[in-house]
Amino acid sequence: VPPGTGWPHDLATPATRVAHGPAEVRDLAASAPTLAELTARQSVCRACPRLVSWREEVAAVRRRSFQAERYWGRPIPGWGAQAPRVLIVGLAPAAHGGNRTGRIFTGDRSGDFLFASLYRCGLADSPVSVTVGDGQRLRNARMVAAVRCAPPANKPTTDERDTCAPWLVAEVAQVAPSVRAIVCLGGFAWQALWPVLRAAGFVLPSRRPPFGHGAETEVRPRDPDAPPVLLLGCYHPSQQNTFTGRVTPDMLDAVFTRARGFSGAGEDSGGSGGRPPGQHGLRRGVHTGQRTGPPAL
């Protein structure tokens, strides 16, 4: 989709500056004056040739079941609240999900599983996320990807992750004043986030806990008077994980209820939108497949 051609919520225009390599990504991310301009610049990035080729090939050929649809076929910027309490970090858009719809975790089964949980936990207006412009709204939450473009086989390279990182650094820095909890969906996002947090000005713990479902630690903003931010690990809601039972609805709900409660995201969200908060609980540590703590009553 060319920028400025009427796609819902597309903030880019034909005049939006385009990054064609890592140095330009760093420059354009760091110099974006507002979150809106950062979003626009992310959405037209062409810094990684392999990812550009793949996302555009998928958008041109299209899956048979989506032949009649127009694909977004561009990088997927972050979306959600402008001043979120909860930041949700995923891996990358799906080729026929976000790359088609223009919004991460939208239009695929992983998104169906994720948004059902976000709705139950009061962090989304609807239990489904179909396409941009469907009325879905995140409540006191924002969603981003460690890599903004759909990668072949859902596996971005280390160089692609590192090239994309300045976009995430800039976005984290812009929303940092309001964020109180960060949920990492999967080990890739967990590992990618540590250098991003440091670059965005956070003080990290001396020992990084290993990734696991329910793993948690606190990071601190550079301002000593600012409250800590809770970092939570969560198994990715991929079909492989959800179909095999490695991650269940209760497991996802436990993580998001913990994030919502710690961050205070439910205090002014306009209602819970589903299951009341406090119905699931996590203790500090790594999830082994069973809930590690009793329900918080």
Where do the language-model regions lie?
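Low-complexity, intrinsically disordered or signal/transmembrane-proximal segments
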Residues: Q279-H280, H287-Q290
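A polyanion-binding, active-site-adjacent surface
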Residues: V1-A215, P221, D225-G264
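Short polybasic linear motifs
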Residues: G270
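Short, intrinsically disordered C-terminal tails of secreted or membrane-associated proteins
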Residues: T292-P294
